[in-house]
Amino acid sequence: MDLFKAFGGKSNSKDIAKERLQLLLVHDRIDTSPRFLEMIKEDILNVISNYVDIDEKGLRVEITKERKSDDTFISALHANIPIKKMKQVIR
Amino acid sequence: MKEAIVITSGKGGVGKTTTTANIGTYLAMKGYKVALVDTDIGLRNLDVVMGLENRIVYDIVDVVEGQCRLKQALIRDKRFDTLYLLPAAQTRDKTAVTPEQMRKLIQDLKEEFDYILVDCPAGIEQGFKNAIAGADRAIVVTTPEVAAVRDADRIIGLLEAAELHNPLLVINRIKMDMVKRGDMMDIEDIIDILAIDLLGVIPDDENIIISTNKGEPIVLDEKSLASQAYRNLVERFLDRNVPLINLDVGNGFMDRLRRLFKMA
């Protein structure tokens, strides 16, 4: 608990700015329509759900920028796929 | 050693021209031979920020069209004799110069100068393409605002696509009191998002407007914090081991209390 937030009246609009930017840039960076990520999402969903039950609402796909060990930056496609349970049949 | 650096931002009004003028002036103060090139054809302003607007005879378009020699168009600074300005044309548009002509121009300038600083127009069209042609490195200027950071990110992508790798970031007009209140993105927030190396941070400072009113780059005035920040930026440009200037000079009761609790 940040004592100064409670008493100092911090409004933290910068967190809102940062969050909005991060979301905005996901789309800007791939330089395509927001539909692009939706299409990837759907295809990932179709393939993975043959093997596991996944939480469709929790599925997140985004493009991020990461620093590599040699200090250059690369774009990466990150998919966060929450698993409900493994499908018995396949295992 | 000879290097052409383009100063760009995407969004207009974030301080490209002021940054170009100050980096160039301080490099010249340090004894380097510097050429400032204004590529904002139709909306030139570097001449005004440098206070050299009354000395323009020829411009960049005259040079590339062969109307005059390069040396005739270069205006020598009032204060430093190793500092020159090649002004943009005011009555033409961005298509008056091609990227090939720019590359040739930069090559020619490299014969005379140590550093060529190219002030890029806002936007991502022809003017931007001209400005980055022939550049060896890029400096991206942004302010701690959503729109400016977004455009900076777009520019970084375009620079990468044009094979201008590892651009350096300048965060302009930061207000430390707003950062402390949590109402302005901090240096770390912006670096986090843009993921490029930080060159320098310039505080929001009224003195910049005062110096621009007079046509004198602020680095000439040692006292102001913005001037020190620009000097620090240039020192870091020349040697990346130079630590970043500390702009957080607040020493009120709350500042000390926060430090005590390691919150600031």
Swiss-Prot record, chain A:
Biological process according to GO: cell division; regulation of division septum assembly
Instruction: Tell me the disulfide pairings in this chain.
Output: none
InterPro entries membership: MinE, MinE_sf
Keywords on record: Cell cycle, Cell division
Q: Which spans of this chain does the record mark as coiled coil? A: none
Q: Does the keyword Glycosyltransferase apply?
A: no
Q: Record keywords: Iron-sulfur included?
A: no
Which family is this protein grouped under?
Belongs to the MinE family.
- List the HAMAP family hit by this protein, alphabetically: MinE
Report the protein's function. Prevents the cell division inhibition by proteins MinC and MinD at internal division sites while permitting inhibition at polar sites. This ensures cell division at the proper site by restricting the formation of a division septum at the midpoint of the long axis of the cell.
Q: What is this protein called?
A: Cell division topological specificity factor
The species this protein was found in = Caldanaerobacter subterraneus subsp. tengcongensis (strain DSM 15242 / JCM 11007 / NBRC 100824 / MB4)
